[in-house]
Structure formats: structure tokens, C-alpha cells
């Protein structure tokens, strides 16, 4: 059995409902509904969730670990939330959050406007910092990757949009 799948999930004050092959996790920040694979059993035991594979097949073992991680992320999302920080490095690179849109000035001849999906918010504490917040870890990471994709860090000067914890290894320029 999967090592990840064996460990129980502490609910941390979130409410869980199991119905029709789906799990609904409700917390102070919102609600997430996730379909449960039929190869995985989910049991609610007084504030903890335990997952186990239906049979001992390799696929069921793998899916029990995957489902455990997805449900644990949903519990963390509705209780604490997720955030991803981005930094803009470069002369004239700026960001500004306006409602559900993120306006980026990234050295193109036109401003880049990124529409935020439902459930994800962007904040700009400074003009060169972006904080993307939400309850769905997959959505937050996807939006951060899309924003970074407009101008990924280039390897010679390091200019571009990067994650705040990302280390860009700079190349040496060509010598004559």
C-alpha cells in the first residue's frame, strides 16, 4: 500500500461530506468538491479521514496516495488557503491588480492583461511583487505559471517574472 495513502488526514476544523462518489470539504474560506476514484475507500473517523485501496492492485495503491494528497490539499485550502508569490525583475516591469484582472507591463509594446479565474485573487503589495491567493492549490499554481509564462526569467541578465523562491542561474556572456 502507498506510504502517503496510509497516513490519516486531520480535518483541522473543516466539515467533510461523503456522497455519490464525491467528497465535499467545507471550511471558513470556502467549499471544494472532489470526485473520488472508485478504487479508493474513504472513511471518516472522528476528525480524521482514512483512505484505503479497494483491492491490492498496483493502480488502487497508487490512486490511494494520490487521492489522499488531493483531499489533504482541499482541507488545507478551505482552512488556511494557498498563496504563490511572484517577483518582477527588470527595468520598467510593473504589475497592478484591478479587481479580477492583473495588468502587467513587461517590456512588450502593449500591456498584458491577465483575467483571474473564479476563486483566485491577485494582490500587488509593491509594483514588482504579485501575490496569488486561493483555496484550490492546483488553480493557484496554474495561474502563477501562466503569469510567469508571459516573460520567464532569461538566463543572461535574469530579467522576467520569477517565483519569489526561484533561483535563476545566470550564464556567462560570450567572450571575444
Swiss-Prot record:
<keyword id="KW-0699">rRNA-binding</keyword>
<keyword id="KW-0687">Ribonucleoprotein</keyword>
<dbReference type="Pfam" id="PF00347">
    <property type="entry name" value="Ribosomal_L6"/>
</dbReference>
<dbReference type="InterPro" id="IPR019906">
    <property type="entry name" value="Ribosomal_uL6_bac-type"/>
</dbReference>
<protein>
    <recommendedName>
        <fullName>Large ribosomal subunit protein uL6</fullName>
    </recommendedName>
</protein>
<comment type="function">
    <text>This protein binds to the 23S rRNA, and is important in its secondary structure. It is located near the subunit interface in the base of the L7/L12 stalk, and near the tRNA binding site of the peptidyltransferase center.</text>
</comment>
<dbReference type="InterPro" id="IPR002358">
    <property type="entry name" value="Ribosomal_uL6_CS"/>
</dbReference>
<dbReference type="GO" id="GO:0003735">
    <property type="term" value="F:structural constituent of ribosome"/>
</dbReference>
<comment type="similarity">
    <text>Belongs to the universal ribosomal protein uL6 family.</text>
</comment>
<dbReference type="GO" id="GO:0002181">
    <property type="term" value="P:cytoplasmic translation"/>
</dbReference>
<dbReference type="InterPro" id="IPR000702">
    <property type="entry name" value="Ribosomal_uL6-like"/>
</dbReference>
<dbReference type="InterPro" id="IPR036789">
    <property type="entry name" value="Ribosomal_uL6-like_a/b-dom_sf"/>
</dbReference>
<keyword id="KW-0689">Ribosomal protein</keyword>
<comment type="subunit">
    <text>Part of the 50S ribosomal subunit.</text>
</comment>
<dbReference type="InterPro" id="IPR020040">
    <property type="entry name" value="Ribosomal_uL6_a/b-dom"/>
</dbReference>
<dbReference type="GO" id="GO:0019843">
    <property type="term" value="F:rRNA binding"/>
</dbReference>
<keyword id="KW-0694">RNA-binding</keyword>
<dbReference type="GO" id="GO:0022625">
    <property type="term" value="C:cytosolic large ribosomal subunit"/>
</dbReference>
Amino acid at each position: 500500500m502507498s506510504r502517503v495513502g496510509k497516513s490519516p488526514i486531520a480535518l483541522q476544523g473543516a466539515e467533510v461530506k461523503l456522497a455519490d462518489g464525491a467528497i465535499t470539504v467545507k471550511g471558513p474560506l470556502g467549499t471544494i468538491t472532489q470526485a473520488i476514484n472508485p478504487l479508493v475507500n474513504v472513511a471518516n473517523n472522528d476528525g480524521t479521514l482514512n483512505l484505503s485501496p479497494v483491492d491490492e492492485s498496483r493502480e488502487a495503491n497508487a490512486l490511494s496516495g494520490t487521492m489522499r494528497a488531493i483531499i489533504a490539499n482541499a482541507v488545507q485550502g478551505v482552512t488556511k488557503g494557498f498563496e504563490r508569490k511572484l517577483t518582477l525583475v527588470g527595468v520598467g516591469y510593473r504589475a497592478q491588480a484591478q479587481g479580477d484582472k492583473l495588468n502587467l507591463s513587461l517590456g512588450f509594446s502593449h500591456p498584458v492583461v491577465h483575467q483571474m479565474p473564479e476563486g483566485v485573487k491577485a494582490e500587488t503589495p509593491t509594483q514588482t511583487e504579485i501575490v496569488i491567493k486561493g483555496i484550490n492549490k492546483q488553480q493557484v499554481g496554474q495561474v502563477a505559471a501562466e503569469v510567469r509564462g508571459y516573460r520567464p526569467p532569461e538566463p543572461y541578465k535574469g530579467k522576467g517574472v520569477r517565483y519569489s523562491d526561484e533561483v535563476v542561474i545566470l550564464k556567462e556572456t560570450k567572450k571575444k
